[in-house]
Amino acid sequence: MNAPAIFAKEYSDYADQVGIDFKVDFTQFTPRATYTSSSLRRAYFRGMKWYIMLPFFVKSADLTNYAFGISQLMAENPAQAKDYDRLESAIDFMVGGSDDLMPVDYLKALDAAKNAPDKEAAIMDYLTKAHNPKIKDMQANYPTVGEVQSADVLLDTKGMRFFSGKFILDSYWTGQLTQGDEANKPGYDQKLPPMASSLEVMGLLGSDYAKSQIPKLDFYKPTNSRAIDKAMKDLAAENATYTDADWMKNLYTGWLWTIKGLFDWQKTNAKSLPPFMQSVAWQAKVLQNASGFWTELRHATILYAKQSFAERGGGDGGCDNRKVPEPPKGYIEPQLLAYQRLSYLAKKTDAGLTEQGYKLNNQYPLKSFIAMMDTVIDYSQRELADAKLNEKVVSITNTDPNDPTNSCTTNSIDGTSDWENIRKVLTQDISDALPVPVEGPVLFAKDKRAAILADVHTGQDSNYPPHILYEGTGVPYVIFTAVDDANGPRLTVGFTYSHYEFTKPYGGQRMTDEDWQTNFYKPGDTYNAFDYVAKSLKPAVNYWYKILFAGK
């Protein structure tokens, strides 16, 4: 493997594990997403990934002793422990709870066993019964095929991580939908495949269109179709038990809940939505938006999330009697539930960071975003009620400032124009709500572009060489929609996500945004972001989006 010099030894060494040959996936140390823009970010990524990836296995006496030593050292240094807890709490709030044992668990084990006659046995009993991981993020090589249970393998990865990878629901799903060379899961008459798809994730978030496309996936075969269907059914049943409080417990799950709102709103309000939003093609468009949204979420949390391992002018003061032109009548896609949830998440983020004592120099755009979402929600509600939007034009006659013997009639918009609010005010609000980079206002081309990439799953078995599943966004598409409501028929134009899914063989460096962007942008000036390659050179569209392009 190619490896940064600082990790050359670690890339070549693999930890020996208990019973099964577990290997640390050192390709995960490739800095990517937002962590490639500076040497500081790259160093932070690698250092934090080390703490996240390397386990102190419970079943290893030596590693368990090391874990206790580290935990006790932290307890003996309260200032450092406080800093650690503050960082850990912020990550938990934004991404999710730890999926592995943490130093605090080992301190609790010591406390629980202090009065036990056999302290060592009591400690091990506590750790054995403590939080079990739900996501397997390590490569496992088995001595035999089809004998070891996936659940047993997962338990064998149990141990302390200094900064545990965070439990995220979508990685849990892909983990439950895949397997390597383990035996069939209990109650399954077929083995699951080693690879997953965004279609499955979107299906579990409520997209009926995504579910209808799963049987066309290249890994959906007669030998595993029943297993995939059963796993999807089991996970859907599990999801049905989640309350809104469950979905809102941290920001990451809240973003999934917002994506879910795109699909739920579409289904619940189908008959009251505009005709163009009732077609199968629109379902594909909503899927593309949701998948692009999800890709950005995975991109933002790529370090911490636990990945499964299968813009006025003035006149000259003369008489201007021109009429006010007809306003360009825009339209806001009325995804009311998603907008309400976005507003909630922004408020939760702002309040949560403030409560934890963070005073971020770039936090103020959140308040602009919240105000913008209030406006978007208001207009969406009015559109759904088929209300007429207002723009009142008034004519005022006064003396011509250039010729007192003549009169001058001027025309102007009286008060607030709904159409100008949609056309200009909201556009400015979007600009005001953009996050400000902590390094300063000047961005490299890479960080100005819409095309980003996130690896979300790694899978293999004895019949399928190891591959990495990537989710990417590309250059946004221009979308035209024919609207006919109380404000009259019109053709509206806007932008929508482009989303791509593909796999690449495992090994070496994992793909970065820079690698992915060569498919859409020409190389050159570090700050020239939007010099595009020919359309013919762009990646192929996934089959489930072809309905948006007349099947092409």
Task: List the predicted regions and their residue ranges.
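Long, non-catalytic protein-protein interaction scaffolds
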Residues: 1-552
